[in-house]
Amino acid sequence: MKPQFLVHDKKDDVGVAVVDITAGEKAAGSCLEDGSKVTIEAKDSIPLGHKIALKAFKKDENVTKYGVIIGHATQAITAGAHVHVHNVKSNRW
């Protein structure tokens, strides 16, 4: 089965949807770094190109993508949730 989302680095705690993912579906992902597989139930619909949470985040917890911190959660985020500008803010500005 082709992956529905990609994880760029083993340290990442979000994946990037390569297809639209429907809420409630078991989404299959693949890590580009080592080829490992991960499956998670999507709690929200995740549009193509957007992020899916691979773990639960507490408010103000850092979010890692590409092996680097890209921002922090502005609210609690459940595993499988849609991760985007509505619940993550860049640490840069």
For the regions a language model picked out, list residue spans one by one.
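N-terminal small-residue-enriched
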Residues: 2-93
